[in-house]
């Protein structure tokens, strides 16, 4: 397109924005119009004109200079863009605002050359135009915008303007440099002081000297411009903290001269080609420190924010706008990848297993986190490193927070299951080698929990110290609880064993009490106590403390004395004492020293034996009613078993330490009255005086009855038939006796009967035979009574019928009335109380 042809809708003189879908690849787009409005559709233009996914692979070039000095022409010739240029005949402003175009190719000395990176060129409205007159506000803002957003700022001046102040735009540049120093100075100072900082961003001021005749060497012109710029920089009003910053900290200078475009067209074209050659060469003009280090989509946002800050005159540090761009883009990436992660998280952890393979869970955690961070890195790593790392940490925290929800559930289940298993294994020890094996179990449980927590803690991302500390505390509490239970079991078993052994000894001693009975019982009791203490020798093998061991021995002593007390009152009661008195009385009263039954011949012998037996029986009553030793001293325990405080502390109901037991205190309260009653009696008191009086009364009643019974038997023995009477009967009945003996039938019957009795006796069947005989006799008597009852019923019809039955005169064919009467008569045959009628009895006898 020639300079004389109109640009139609793509003309840079148009103040309205051009839609992206109507722009050709060579056309430009207006970034900022003359009304200072920023075009938000720049990114769409770049995406259509530049190669896809250029990322950081781009450069921004801007041009600055007076109006109608050929800025647009230079850009079009050098970068092959299509910016509107001035009409030779009108000499008026053509570029309004700021325009942007993508350079398809570069003009070089060898024709057209392509740069390795995409080049975007900004054509800035010229300064000192008659259209704006003295209004330099837009000029300053446009210059500052170009300086802030570009890598290379082309200062387009004529050779005749070198050395001038206003003509070379030195006044405008001074204002721009002051604002630039104010805005960029703080970050530049920080990066300069921070030796580790990689931020050393600069802007290349490429001074293009136009219409160079050649009389003055370019080096001299460059020296003049350099001196003027540095002098101007030194004259800037710098804040105190920024005075040490030099011109070189912000800018690099480079120079290139071009001949007159019209008078020397070939030389002009050759000069443009030489400049293009430098642009093609890597790291010649486009050096890494000039790049803004943000991707192209971030640069568009950065440019928009820069213009917003410049337009509103907000005194902010513009490099933070780069950070804002990075923050905005990185936040977008974070939201995207975290949303994908959340969806996958819901699918994987919709249902959480109670006992999973924690190593697999930990690997799944790591894979999920690595995947989401890799997705973030692929997109966000091209932005500002500090922001990228900051947002990466934010994403890391979000992922950790989400995964920690699952971690907390797994950790809770792990601790609960581990505690349950540990408690079960601990109980299964049943006290065997408890100290060593419980230590081994606790170490094993802690090691396993620590290992599993490390698997799912994302390499320490989730704190496990508190969980491990709590688990260790719970293990210690369970161990202490089981130690207490095992300790109480040992004490309880020892008390039970003592009680069983002591019970047998006491029963043996109390069967035949003597003055030494309680001495022997107490001695054996102490021996059983010593057996327990010597067996454990101050330690129970449970790894318990010395205080706990002492408390266990004290509990054993208390409970053993309490068991002793309970045994005394179990084995010695009113009924048992009365029974023993009766037994001892019977042993003396009914049997002699050889154990044979006594047969008393007279009352005197009976009375003497009765007195001796009674004295023998009552002799043990003092021994059984109070626990006294042979020295007449009562048995007193080493510990007061009747004190309420000790009974609550050492009682059997407290043997398990009240762990998770309800109602323990209420049970103790219910037994308070009983404890009061026990405390009133004392240990040695077994049977009080009231009970003793009851025993004596019952005993006297029983022995008096036995005395009277025995005395009656003596009287019967005295009044019985004399023995000589039997001799007289034998002599007088001798003939009859011999007649029976001589009769073969009776003699044989007697022999058979005697032999049968002998056989039954030898086979121990005599008693069963007598029982059978007795039942047979009873049955015969019952049948006889029944027959007699039938005869004695007071009814002549029934009597006649019964008599006919007895004589066999009842005929088969009988009248229906007689049959009915017989049915009625059967009701009277049922057993019922009936008085015997003497008249009917006489009738029966007469018949």
From Swiss-Prot:
- Statement: the UniProt record of this protein carries the keyword Membrane: yes
Cytoplasmic topological intervals: 1-720, 766-847
Question: Quick one: a GO biological-process term for this protein?
Answer: endoplasmic reticulum membrane fusion
* Gene3D superfamilies in UniProt: P-loop containing nucleotide triphosphate hydrolases
Domain of life of the organism encoding this protein: Eukaryota
Record-listed GTP binding positions: 65-72
Which cellular component, as a GO term, is one annotated location?
A: cortical endoplasmic reticulum
Main location (coarse class): endoplasmic reticulum
What InterPro entries does its record include?
G_GB1_RHD3_dom, P-loop_NTPase, RHD3/Sey1, Sey1/RHD3-like_3HB
MF terms in GO: GTP binding; GTPase activity
The UniProt record lists the EC number as 3.6.5.-
> What are the alphabetically sorted keywords of the record?
Endoplasmic reticulum, GTP-binding, Hydrolase, Membrane, Nucleotide-binding, Transmembrane, Transmembrane helix
Membrane topology listed for this record = Multi-pass membrane protein
Q: What is this protein called?
A: Protein SEY1
Subcellular location(s) per record: Endoplasmic reticulum membrane
Residue ranges constituting the GB1/RHD3-type G domain according to the UniProt record: 55-290
- Give the similarity note: Belongs to the TRAFAC class dynamin-like GTPase superfamily. GB1/RHD3 GTPase family. RHD3 subfamily.
Top EC group? hydrolase
Which sequence ranges are marked TM in the entry? 721-741, 745-765
Write out the topological domains of type Lumenal. Answer: 742-744
What this chain does, per the entry, is described as: Cooperates with the reticulon proteins and tubule-shaping DP1 family proteins to generate and maintain the structure of the tubular endoplasmic reticulum network. Has GTPase activity, which is required for its function in ER organization.
């Amino acid at each position: 397109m020639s300079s004389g042809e109109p640009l139609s809708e793509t003309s840079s003189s148009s103040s309205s924005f051009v839609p992206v879908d109507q722009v050709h690849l060579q056309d430009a787009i207006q970034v900022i119009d003359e009304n200072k409005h920023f075009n938000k559709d720049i990114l769409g233009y770049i995406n259509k004109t530049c190669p896809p996914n250029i990322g950081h692979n781009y450069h921004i070039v801007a041009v600055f200079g007076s109006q109608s000095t050929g800025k647009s022409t230079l850009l079009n010739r050098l970068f092959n863009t299509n910016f509107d240029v001035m009409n030779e005949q009108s000499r008026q402003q053509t570029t309004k605002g700021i325009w942007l175009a993508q350079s398809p190719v570069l003009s070089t000395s060898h024709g057209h050359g392509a740069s390795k990176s995409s080049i975007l060129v900004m054509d800035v409205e010229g300064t000192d135009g008659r259209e704006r007159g003295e209004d330099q506000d837009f000029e300053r803002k446009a210059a500052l915008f170009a300086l802030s957003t570009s890598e290379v700022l082309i200062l387009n001046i004529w050779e005749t303007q070198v050395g001038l102040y206003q003509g070379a735009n030195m006044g405008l540049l001074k204002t721009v440099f002051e604002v630039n120093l104010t805005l960029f100075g703080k970050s530049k100072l920080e990066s300069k002081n921070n030796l580790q900082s990689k931020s050393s961003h600069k802007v290349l001021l490429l001074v293009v000297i136009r219409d160079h005749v050649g009389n003055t060497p370019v080096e001299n012109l460059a020296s003049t411009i350099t001196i003027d710029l540095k002098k101007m920089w030194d004259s800037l009003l710098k804040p105190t903290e920024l005075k040490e910053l030099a011109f070189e900290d912000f800018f690099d200078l480079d120079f290139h001269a071009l001949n007159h475009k019209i008078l020397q067209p070939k030389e002009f074209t050759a000069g443009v080609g030489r400049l293009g050659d430098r642009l093609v060469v890597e790291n010649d003009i486009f050096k890494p420190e000039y790049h803004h280090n943000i991707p192209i989509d971030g640069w568009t946002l950065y440019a928009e924010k820069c213009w917003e800050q410049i337009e509103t005159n907000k005194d902010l540090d513009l490099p933070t706008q780069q950070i804002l761009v990075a923050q905005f883009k990185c936040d977008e990436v974070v939201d995207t990848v975290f949303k994908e992660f959340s969806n996958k998280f819901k699918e994987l952890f919709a249902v959480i297993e109670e006992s999973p393979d924690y190593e697999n869970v930990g690997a799944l955690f790591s894979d999920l986190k690595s995947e989401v961070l890799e997705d973030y890195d692929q997109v966000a790593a091209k932005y500002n490193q500090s922001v990228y790392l900051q947002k990466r940490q934010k994403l890391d925290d979000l992922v950790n927070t989400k995964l920690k929800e699952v971690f907390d559930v797994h950790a809770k289940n792990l601790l609960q299951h581990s505690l349950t298993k540990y408690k079960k294994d601990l109980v299964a020890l049943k006290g065997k080698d408890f100290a060593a094996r419980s230590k081994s179990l606790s170490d094993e449980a802690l090691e396993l929990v620590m290992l599993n927590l490390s698997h799912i803690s994302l390499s320490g991302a989730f704190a496990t110290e508190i969980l491990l500390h709590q688990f260790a505390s719970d293990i210690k509490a369970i161990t202490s609880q089981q130690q207490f239970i095992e300790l109480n079991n040992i004490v309880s078993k020892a008390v039970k064993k003592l009680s069983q052994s002591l019970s047998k000894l006491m029963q043996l001693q109390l069967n035949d009490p003597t003055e030494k009975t309680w001495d022997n019982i107490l001695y054996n009791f102490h021996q059983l106590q010593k057996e327990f203490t010597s067996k454990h020798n101050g330690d129970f093998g449970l790894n318990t403390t010395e205080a706990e061991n002492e408390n266990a021995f004290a509990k054993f002593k208390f409970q053993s004395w309490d068991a002793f007390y309970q045994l005394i009152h179990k084995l010695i009661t009113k009924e048992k004492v009365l029974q023993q008195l009766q037994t001892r009385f019977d042993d003396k009263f009914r049997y002699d020293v050889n154990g044979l039954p006594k047969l008393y011949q007279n009352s005197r012998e009976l009375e003497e034996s009765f007195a001796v037996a009674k004295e023998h029986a009552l002799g043990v009553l003092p021994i059984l009613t109070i626990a006294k030793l042979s020295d007449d001293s009562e048995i007193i325990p080493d510990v007061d078993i009747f004190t309420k405080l000790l009974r609550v502390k050492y009682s059997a109901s407290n043997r398990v330490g009240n762990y998770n037991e309800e109602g323990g205190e209420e049970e103790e309260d219910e037994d308070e009255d009983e404890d009061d009653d026990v405390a009133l009696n004392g240990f040695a008191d077994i049977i009080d005086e009231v009970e003793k009086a009851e025993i004596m009364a019952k005993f006297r009643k029983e022995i008096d009855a036995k005395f009277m019974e025995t005395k009656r038997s003596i009287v019967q023995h005295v009044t019985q038939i004399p023995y000589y009477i039997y001799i007289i009967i034998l002599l007088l009945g001798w003939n009859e006796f011999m007649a029976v003996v001589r009769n073969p039938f009776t003699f044989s019957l007697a022999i058979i009967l005697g032999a049968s009795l002998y056989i039954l006796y030898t086979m121990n069947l005599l008693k069963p035979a007598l029982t059978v005989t007795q039942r047979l006799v009873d049955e015969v008597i019952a049948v006889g009574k029944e027959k007699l009852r039938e005869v004695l019923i007071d009814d002549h019809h029934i009597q006649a019928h019964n008599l006919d039955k007895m004589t066999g005169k009842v005929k088969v064919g009988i009248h229906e009335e007689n049959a009915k009467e017989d049915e009625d008569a059967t009701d009277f045959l049922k057993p019922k109380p009936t008085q015997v009628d003497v008249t009917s009895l006489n009738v029966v006898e007469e018949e």
